[in-house]
Swiss-Prot record:
Coiled coil: none
Name the record gives this protein: Altered inheritance of mitochondria protein 21
Biased composition annotated in UniProt, kind: Polar residues: 39-50, 85-95, 192-213, 319-334, 381-399, 590-607
Compartments, as annotated in UniProt: Cytoplasm, Cytoskeleton, Actin patch
Source organism per UniProt: Debaryomyces hansenii (strain ATCC 36239 / CBS 767 / BCRC 21394 / JCM 1990 / NBRC 0083 / IGC 2968) (Yeast)
Family: Belongs to the AIM21 family.
Origin: domain of life: Eukaryota
Length: 661
């Protein structure tokens, strides 16, 4: 087991050789550099003192930072390290170191498990000088990290050294320390929670040595390396004892895991150890040298040591908080489930109670039917009944349902072929189904219902009208209308037009009008005949008298055309109207005119016959002209009607006949 423990420390020894060679070159530098070197030496001293307390598995994370420093772009700052005093001068790592560091990064957890398992077996498995040199190498790499500034999270020792360097350089850059806390939590989850207790106990032992180191740093005095090395060895022995006791308490499962991890790390370390064999041999020789006192000069380990228990306490508190939160969540879930269960119970209980109430209300008997005094009562009765709502009017339903009940009561003795369920179903369909369509010649089945409803509704309406009370329209009290408004006003409208009533025409329906006309015509004819006879007698008497004989000149002068015309107009015995009816004729006028005409005619004829022979030729010509004058006038001036000419012709014919007789 001792060989297996020494193998993981092999890659870290070559830097021990660099540290031994560098102090010879660092004698002629300033005091400022020596002070910083002293501080770093004190930090190394604190690392050596707390190695056992912080467990060896913390160591492998230092090489990670050396790798980052070697690969970082800040490599030009490396040559300044040899200026430091005897404490620790660091050069850039050789190319042979880089693969070692990479392997260490991959296997830092396996080394951690191997170191723990080695402490289980024996306290003498780890030699104090080897462990001191191992920590010294870690300190040198931490110095490189301070210059470069690129840091990766590591275990507890790396955390403390990082925090110390950050406090020296920048007080504000604390992000790397926070990252280390997260890595610690992850490591504990992987390795188990059993390692929390021993780490806390180890950290409690650290501050005593760290405080003394801090005082030495403040006074800038260097303590003897031998005394510090002895103290560190004593502390290691105590820590190994504690680790052995704690390892016995661990579960067997953890031991199996640690054994497996050791086997893996051994294989990887063998591959790594093939290249740096020379450096390991030189480092083993340097361990025996007296330059080891540089290790105990890390006093600022105390600050990190004090911070570690704080971090551990924070982790414990976090775990407690998580447990408390889980408990609270479980309690809240339980409470929610209980509340939901209680709500469901209450809802079920509420739903059950109305069902029970409904069940209790169903068996109650319906109220006694009352006489239907109005439609409202019939409407209420329809709702009280449990049957389905039919389509017909409420009154017909209300009348039909009691009839069904009476029929059922009468037919109780007769066993029904249908079951009770079917009977109920049929009763419920009575109002829903129609009576069908009436065939031709049949009476409409709904006609009787309409008649019944009208008969029932008519007395109700009459009663309502008789019971109605008219509201009295009351005007505003305490006010009276003026008299001008109380008395009625008669408005008379005068029409625009004056209307006159008169009979414009009449119709007389007489059947004897034609007979009267015929009689009138006969009378006229008789009168004319009598007149003609009388005229003839007068003419005969006048022929015998000479008084009526006149000269042709006197006749011609006395009878102008106008007089002749008037005479003929007056001598006309008849006057014919537009209706071809004879008017009354004055007999006296006709007789006188006729007599005058006859006399004038006779006188003219006699004068012509008598005087024509005795007169001279000059006179004859004059007489002829005078005699012809009246004829011309008669022809030219007299324009007689056809009737008048006819009468004259008749007269002349009569006269001629008489003369012949």
């Amino acid at each position: 087991m001792s060989d297996s423990i020494s193998r993981p420390s092999i890659p870290r020894r070559p830097k021990k050789q660099l540290q031994v060679d560098l102090p010879n070159h660092s004698e002629g530098f300033d005091r400022s550099d020596t002070e910083s070197d002293n501080e770093q030496m004190v930090s190394l001293e604190s690392l050596e003192s707390n190695e056992a307390s912080d467990k060896i598995p913390v160591i492998p994370k230092r090489p990670d930072r050396s790798k980052s420093s070697s690969k970082s772009p800040s490599l030009p700052a490396i040559p300044k390290r040899p200026q430091k005093s005897d404490t620790s001068g660091v050069e850039s790592p050789s190319p042979s170191d880089l693969p070692e560091v990479e392997n260490e990064e991959e296997n830092h957890k396996s080394i951690y498990d191997e170191s723990v398992s080695s402490k289980k077996h024996s306290d003498d498995a780890i030699e104090p000088p080897e462990s001191s040199e191992f920590n010294y190498e870690v300190g040198d790499r931490s110095d490189v990290d301070v210059s470069d500034g690129d840091k990766t999270p590591g275990n507890t020792n790396t955390k403390t050294s990082i925090k110390e360097d950050l406090n020296i350089t920048d007080d504000n850059s604390m992000h790397s320390f926070d990252d280390d806390l997260e890595t610690v939590l992850q490591d504990r989850d992987d390795n188990g929670s059993s390692s929390i207790g021993p780490e806390i106990s180890q950290d409690n032992n650290v501050p005593s040595s760290s405080e003394s180191d801090i005082n030495a740093e403040l006074g800038e005095e260097y303590t003897d390396p031998d005394s510090n090395s002895q103290k560190s060895c004593g502390n290691r022995d105590k820590e190994n004892d504690e680790l052995s006791t704690e390892s016995d308490k661990r579960n067997p499962n953890e031991r199996d895991q640690s054994n497996k991890s050791e086997e893996k790390t051994i294989k990887k370390d063998q591959e790594v150890s093939n290249t740096p064999k020379v450096t390991d041999a030189e480092a083993s020789e340097d361990r025996d040298s007296d330059n080891i006192p540089h290790i105990p000069r890390r006093p600022k380990k105390s600050k990190s040591a004090t911070s570690e228990p704080d971090a551990k306490s924070i982790e414990v508190e976090n775990l407690d908080n998580t447990n408390i939160i889980d408990q609270k969540q479980t309690q809240t879930n339980k409470d929610n489930n209980e509340e939901a269960y209680s709500i469901n119970e209450t809802s079920e209980s509420k739903s059950e109670t109305p069902q029970q109430e409904k069940n209790t209300t169903k068996p109650k008997a319906p109220p006694k039917p009352k006489k239907l005094s109005s439609k409202i009562a019939a409407f209420q009765q329809m709702f009280n009944q449990e049957t389905a709502p039919p389509r017909n009017s409420g009154t017909s339903k209300s009348t039909s349902k009691p009839d069904l009940e009476t029929k059922n009561s009468e037919n109780k003795e007769v066993p029904s072929r249908l079951s009770t369920d079917k009977m109920k179903f049929a009763q419920s369909l009575q109002g829903m189904m129609g009576k069908g369509i009436a065939m031709p010649g049949m009476v409409n089945p709904n006609f009787h219902q309409k008649i019944d409803t009208e008969e029932i509704e008519s007395p109700d309406k009459e009663v309502k009208i008789s019971n109605m009370k008219r509201g009295i329209a009351k005007g505003p009290r305490g006010k009276k209308l003026p008299k001008s408004l109380k008395n009625p006003v008669n408005v008379e409208v005068t029409p625009r037009f004056n209307s006159f009533v008169s009979t414009i025409w009449e119709l007389n329906f007489q059947a004897d009008t034609k007979s009267n006309d015929m009689e009138g015509s006969e009378n006229v004819s008789n009168n004319t005949e009598a007149q003609k006879s009388e005229n003839n007698e007068e003419i005969l008497n006048l022929e015998n008298k000479s008084e009526y004989i006149m000269d042709s000149e006197s006749v011609s002068n006395s009878t102008p055309a106008s007089d002749i015309k008037e005479i003929r107009e007056e001598s006309s015995p008849l006057k014919i109207d537009d209706d071809d009816v004879y008017s009354e004729i004055d007999k006296s006028k006709t007789t006188q005119s006729e007599s005058r005409n006859l006399e004038s005619i006779d006188s003219t004829e006699g004068s012509r016959n008598i005087d024509a022979e005795n007169l001279p030729e000059e006179i004859k010509s004059d007489n002829d002209s005078a005699a012809s004058y009246p004829k011309k006038s008669e022809d030219s001036d007299l324009d007689l009607d056809d009737n008048e000419q006819h009468i004259l012709e008749n007269q002349e014919s009569d006269l001629n006949l008489r003369k012949e007789d």
